[in-house]
Amino acid sequence: MTKNNEVGWNLDNSYATLPQSFYTEIPPTPVSSPELVKLNHSLAISLGFNPEELKKEAEIAIFAGNALPEGAHPLAQAYAGHQFGHFNMLGDGRALLIGEQITPSGKRFDIQLKGSGPTPYSRRGDGRAALGPMLREYIISEAMYALDIPTTRSLAVVTTGEPTYRETKLPGAILTRVASSHIRVGTFQYAAARGSIEDLQSLADYTIKRHYPEIEAHENRYTALLQEVIKKQASLIAKWQLVGFIHGVMNTDNITISGETIDYGPCAFMDNYDQGTVFSSIDTQGRYAYGNQPYMAAWDLARLAESLIPILHEDEEEALKIAQDEISKFSVQYEKQWFIGMKKKLGLFSNEEQDQSLIEQLFKMMEKYKADYTNTFRSLTLDTLENTPLFDSPEFKEWYKLWQSRLEKQEESKENAYEMMKNNNPSIIPRNHRVEEALEAAVTNGDYSVMEKLLEALANPYAYSTDQEEYCVPPAPTNRPYRTFCGT
């Protein structure tokens, strides 16, 4: 173990206080010649680290799993999951939680190495990760953070000096992922499937203490836990939909109890507005299509409610009723959050009867004319309506008049309305073709400058600066249809 207080390590291991069935203690598998290729300076500082120290050989060895910091307690977490509707016992097959960093402000964050070698949950996998998918997770998770969407984050990426074999031979890498925790709906499914009410209660109590301490004294804290998670997920999915983010693999093991977005495998951002948009190569039925995401979140949360039934009430029928009642509230909460967000995207402060219809009409036209989702709202925000099939259409011109007269009805000025739009309509998203361009340069040519430039632009998505304009251009028809892969 390395001991260096100048670096800023301040690890605790509260997860290891849970019953041992929830994890397996296992060290990372060392790699031959690690090199640091990306460090997140601002995140490092917020976690209490000295970024300059993290660039030193001793700390790079930690990011690679070749050494452990003082206080580390590496473990692979066990969990289950419905993967495309099919239930499996799973677990961290290529990741290890090395500990929980306590920040200078007293907050607790999991520090996880992703690609750190095989574990008892690897299911015949090699436990490793390729450089491309790890850089991709870094780019997208940091873009999500800048968009103000709850997310896990990326502290560092190191190359391992060893190949990883997928369809082809690829350079290996390890990502250091930071999360409020890695407790998932699947963690509760795992506890329930094992059949021990004591273990299930231990997990629920731990989760409440860690994420929702304000409900500890609630008369039925387990019902309150379900309510809190539903609230968090309703807000999260609304935020995804509002920026056109498609997760791609909303299995129950990828739904966090903290309400953070996790697992950036086959995710992507929508170009042309289409409710049926799917990018993931393995989602052949469109289960996790853009328009299905709210329904799939409700489905996943119903699996959480099922898992909690043994502790919701001593009477099983009453417990089932509580679970059903709570799950039925998700769609109302989601729709409310989405509607509030959409009104902000259109500069609407007050409530008017026509608002729902105004929004619906816009989306019908966007779908009809295959309008770019992000750029449509960007153009409305800037009030610069370029020559596009949507903006040139007679029905849009009619809609635009209605919208303008709706803005004029408000007490707030139009300037204030456009300012609110600017704060809610990103000018830039991680366009799929731009992300691929950055990954190609880094992985194939060892040129990280394309990625650095992209990350710099993505860090301020609401800036509307001229430097970002090149990143606002939608992909050429030759870059479509875009397909994503999970990288495992």
From Swiss-Prot:
InterPro entries xref list: SelO
EC number: 2.7.7.-, 2.7.7.108
One Gene Ontology molecular-function label: AMPylase activity
Listed transmembrane segments: none
Keywords from the UniProt entry: ATP-binding, Magnesium, Manganese, Metal-binding, Nucleotide-binding, Nucleotidyltransferase, Transferase
Residues noted as binding Mg(2+) in the record, renumbered to the chain: N254, D263
Cysteine pairs bridged by disulfides in the record: none
Pfam families on file: SelO (PF02696)
Residues annotated as binding ATP: G91, G93, R94, K114, D126, G127, R177, R184, D263
Cofactor: Mg(2+); Mn(2+)
Keyword Transmembrane helix tagged: no
Active site: D253
Highest taxon of source: Bacteria
UniProt catalytic activity: L-seryl-[protein] + ATP = 3-O-(5'-adenylyl)-L-seryl-[protein] + diphosphate; L-threonyl-[protein] + ATP = 3-O-(5'-adenylyl)-L-threonyl-[protein] + diphosphate; L-tyrosyl-[protein] + ATP = O-(5'-adenylyl)-L-tyrosyl-[protein] + diphosphate; L-histidyl-[protein] + UTP = N(tele)-(5'-uridylyl)-L-histidyl-[protein] + diphosphate
Biological function: Nucleotidyltransferase involved in the post-translational modification of proteins. It can catalyze the addition of adenosine monophosphate (AMP) or uridine monophosphate (UMP) to a protein, resulting in modifications known as AMPylation and UMPylation.
NCBIfam families in the record: PRK00029.1 (NF000658)
Family indicated by similarity: Belongs to the SELO family.
Protein name: Protein nucleotidyltransferase YdiU
Organism: Bacillus thuringiensis (strain Al Hakam)
